[in-house]
Structure formats: C-alpha cells, structure tokens
Amino acid sequence: MKRTYQPSKLVRKRRHGFRARMATVGGRRVIAARRARGRKRLSA
C-alpha cells in the first residue's frame, strides 16, 4: 500500500495556495478568518 501523502510543491500551491483561496468565496472566508486570528501564514 502506498502512503497517502506524496509531497509536491506544485500541487500544494495549486490546491492550497493564496490564489486558489482567493478564487472562491469559501476560500476568501478562510483567508479572512486567518487574518482575524492574526496568523503569520495565511496560506500554503
């Protein structure tokens, strides 16, 4: 059985990156919530 986490910088950016978040309403909410909490990193 292969492991479920096969790291890839490109896939990580495309799925969880800032621009991916900003592309949807839900993603924008995620960014807003993380800004409100004062997170140092908003996205991947």
From Swiss-Prot:
GO CC annotation: ribonucleoprotein complex; ribosome
GO biological process: translation
Keyword hit for Ribonucleoprotein: yes
UniProt keyword Chloroplast, yes or no: no
Keywords associated with the record: Ribonucleoprotein, Ribosomal protein
GO molecular function: structural constituent of ribosome
Gene3D superfamilies: 1.10.287.3980
Pfam family, one: Ribosomal_L34
Top-level lineage group: Bacteria
Family per record: Belongs to the bacterial ribosomal protein bL34 family.
Protein name (Swiss-Prot/TrEMBL): Large ribosomal subunit protein bL34
Organism name: Methylobacterium nodulans (strain LMG 21967 / CNCM I-2342 / ORS 2060)
Gene expressing this chain: rpmH
